[in-house]
Amino acid sequence: MSLIQSLKLVLARPHPAARPFLLASGAAALAGRALPWRPARWLGTASGLFFGFCLYFFRDPERVPPVDTHLALAPADGHVVSVEKVVPPDSLDMGDVPVWRVATFLSVLDVHVNRMPAAGTVTRVAYHPGQFLNASLDKASELNERNALRLTLPDGRNMAVVQIAGLIARRILCDAEEGMTYEAGERFGLIRFGSRTDLYLPPGVEPLVTVGQTMVGGETVMARL
């Protein structure tokens, strides 16, 4: 990645979910630095640092999906922590035939915006309260707080994306609702401060990624549909 590309990524506009954090920390930074008391200045400095962290964490860079519409794209940035065949969760109503699940772990330093892996219609949204285990653990898929979306492709096949909260992440944001139609790579949500995103491929579709591979949400090809 070139220096210019790196700067564009770091300086990308923040996601709307950052607004309350930026307003609060920005106001505290200005107030703290304006007051004559040393503790207030320390608080102002700390608030300024948190403001910078929020700008970086909530960055929302533009992505350019491939023109080929027969691809499943990464729903999130991060690195692949597991690729295995499993039976989809009952809440997705995708049957009991094992399909490939690709789990992507997002560290605090990754872009946390979630994107649709393919063009289609959201036909199910199911939220599950749960624990906040380390999202890189395999059991996080079943025990952690999560939000599952089933996406029906134009040809009628189903695939799914599951947003999973992690040890630090305590807030899943999802704009998608049942009946909404999305294009591949289009934004649909965000998970705050470290998380995991699972992609369930349609039956018969093989993954093209391996454990440890770095994902770029909305751009990296995970499978051919």
From Swiss-Prot:
Query: Per its UniProt entry, which superkingdom is the organism in?
Result: Bacteria
Names of required cofactors = pyruvate
Q: In which pathway does it act?
A: Phospholipid metabolism; phosphatidylethanolamine biosynthesis; phosphatidylethanolamine from CDP-diacylglycerol: step 2/2
One Gene Ontology term of the biological-process aspect is: phosphatidylethanolamine biosynthetic process
Q: Does the keyword Translocase apply?
A: no
Please provide, in alphabetical order, the Gene Ontology terms of the cellular component aspect for this entry. plasma membrane
Q: Which of the seven top EC classes does this enzyme belong to?
A: lyase
Q: What is its EC number?
A: 4.1.1.65
Q: Which reaction does it catalyse?
A: a 1,2-diacyl-sn-glycero-3-phospho-L-serine + H(+) = a 1,2-diacyl-sn-glycero-3-phosphoethanolamine + CO2
In the record, the note on similarity to other proteins reads: Belongs to the phosphatidylserine decarboxylase family. PSD-A subfamily.
Q: How does it assemble?
A: Heterodimer of a large membrane-associated beta subunit and a small pyruvoyl-containing alpha subunit.
What is this protein's name? Phosphatidylserine decarboxylase proenzyme
